[in-house]
Structure formats: structure tokens, C-alpha cells
Amino acid sequence: MKILIPTAKEMNTDLPSIEANPLRPESQAVLDALALYSASQLESFYKVSAEKAVEEFQHIQALKRQTAQHYPALNLFDGLMYRHIKRDKLTEAEQVYLENHVFITSALYGVVPALSPMAPHRLDFLMKLKVAGKTLKSHWKTAYDEALKQEEMIFSLLSSEFETVFSKEIREKMVTFKFMEDRGGQLKIHSTISKKARGAFLTALIENQVQTVEEARRLSFAGFNYREDLSQPQELVFVKEV
């Protein structure tokens, strides 16, 4: 069983660095394509300020020169979902579960274990980067499928932009999750609720060593409980009353 989570734009590099792994060929091809952009071109590519574009340019060039600092990916990313994941003071069993089951989907590194070394970078599948004439999704599809072809059970905490990198055959194995708030009988869903809840849900999976859909249904976390009446066999809905 594998649990898939996305990358995040926000990063925290105030961490001890770790040794890098050699880049796989698919990653090197993406890096080579990114490295063709000047800082001013990156400003429009990323739709960021000139200052931010220079920072990203430096990240890319450091990766090219193999001088970039690397950090465990789960600790490097620091978006809302990540800040709600239990990332330290793990028991030995929780650490083993995390290492065996939690994987990050990256547009630069592929599908990798959550504690894999990553360097700071900014890239997702909505960005219009061409790699040898292909979109990022087309470039990664074979490698993404290969990473999961042996899996019978896949828990996806991904947004659709990441899920659609996988073939239909792989997506059909995925169990997805929806997190909603019940405000006086009105069910609400928005990205802030979803991101926080994904992190809290992953924490509950880790703490309870969940291996099956049935075990996931029984979880209660951060005020969320499973709602059978709103769920489908491959989409579990959790609701928090506020």
C-alpha cells in the first residue's frame, strides 16, 4: 500500500542538510529544460516577482552545478498540508510506516519516498515546461506508472493535476478522500479545509498504521469523522461539524 502526497510551493531550509542522490534521467531532462531559462524569463514562467525569479534561477543553477543543498523532502516542504503532518517525535513504528508507505509526487524528482533528499525548487504539472517536446505530464507518465504498477492499494491525497499524470489503469486503483465542514447543516469544502485535513489525515494514518480502506473509515482526527452516506467505494468523505 502506498500513500501519495503532492509537493508544496512553501519550503523551509532551516534544517540540517543531507547527502543528495544522483538525479534519474527523467529528472535530469527536466532540469536541463529549466536551466535554459534566464532569471527574467523565469519571472514570467513562474508568474512571480523579479526577486523571486532570481532566487529560483539560483536554485536551478545550483542543481545544475551539483552544489545545491538537499533536505528530506517531507521536512523541506512547508505548505499548509505539510505543517499539519506529524514530522518529528515519531515512534520507531511510525518512522518505519512513513518510510515504507508515504511517497511524494514531484514534477522534478518523480514518485519518491517521503524522506528522499530534495533540493529547493519550484515546479508543478500546471507549468508549461516542454521536455524534449513533451509536456511534463507526458514526460513523467511512464515513470509514474512504473512506480505504482505493483501496488494493489493506493491512497491518493493528490490534487487532480498530479493524479492525471498516472494512466487510467493506475488511477482506477486509487482511493481518494474528500474533507468537508458541516456548518449548521451546510456542507462546505475549500482548499484551506482540504489542505489542513490532508495533513491531519496523513498523521492519523501514520499513528494508526493504517493498511486498509476499512481501517481508514474508522479514523477520527482533528474533529473529522467518516460519513458513509456521502462516500463512494473509492472516495471516502470525512466531515467536521463546526
Predicted regions and their residues:
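Active-site helix-to-loop segments that bind/position phosphate- or nucleotide-bearing substrates
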Residues: 2-89
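Internal, well-folded beta-alpha domain core
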Residues: 86-233, 237-242
